[in-house]
Amino acid sequence: MPKPNSITLKRIFYDNSHWQGYIGMREIDPDVIQQVESMMKCGDYPEQVKYYICPKCETREKRAFRCKTRICTHCGKQFADAWAIKMERDLYQVIHRHMIFTIPSSIWPFMDEHRHLWKTMLDTVYQVLQEMMSKTGWDEVIPGVICIFHPFGKDLKFNPHVHALVTEGGLKKDMMTEWVHMTYFPYEILRKKWQYLFLKNLRKATKDTLTHWTIEEPCFDKYRNGFYVRARDRVWNAKELGGYVVRYVRHPAIAESRLIGYDGNYVTFYYERMDDSDKDGQRVEVTLPVMEFIDKIVNLIPPKGFKMIRHYGLYSRNQKGKVKEIMCGLHFYCRKKEEKLNALMNIVWKTLCPKCGEEMIPEEQYCPT
């Protein structure tokens, strides 16, 4: 059970049987229920406990089971830490551009209802980048692209958008041994291509002529300059990039440090705006009825099995081994650093002895010599 005086997700869900009341009023996917209830039990003593022993100094420790769900603020942060290390390990040592591809709020309810279309957004981003490079004379260059689907904004509203990490340049298709630098990303082409290809692919995926008249035509009419794309942020090294993107992408829906008020009926939290206006970075406080707050948190859980992160071009999994060897030869990738970061990433998940630092093992597996 959560501590009575702290404002945590667990406390809000447990308090006054809010969660039981919530599921009693709605039809909810069983996988979503399982994730939420795992989060509510995460780290509880004494029900969810495993005993460990250090094989070196025989120190005994009890550790609570962890749920490892995305919704959990503790496990979500642990995943974020591990993912930041993984990003630093896998990214090539070249300058990347951090881009954000958005869609108008009028399409959000449609994308919320048809969650199988989320993959369409991810695939379309890479298609846009390919066509943009072709338009600007870089069609013989293969970039590295990692796309991350993000279903919500900092205000917890459903706001589907895609973060893309794009190498500023790529390898030539013919030889695959020469790196070509590219620093110019034309906003006008990006925005219009993103609008056109996304709406086209949306209609193709739904196979519904109604989509053309209710979504496609109004969007072309209203957004004549295309959909908004932010592509101004350059990131210079892999370590900075890993931390930079995790801050926006891989974290839990809301950090508990942002929960600043709860009285049993209402929840207050804050966020900082991120846009191109003069209000960028401004703190905004939001107060919601507790059931509405729970509904927002639950609605952000992705469908079971959906891959939020996808790799394209030089980062695609079927080219990964070959490209790494080429990038090593060009001094854009370091095998020694990869080994070091692999070891560091393993530490995130290991249970280490508080006395000697040795990896602990489950007590039932211990055989004293």
What are these regions (language model features)?
Residues 1-369:
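Beta->alpha loop/short-helix hinge microenvironment recognizer with preference
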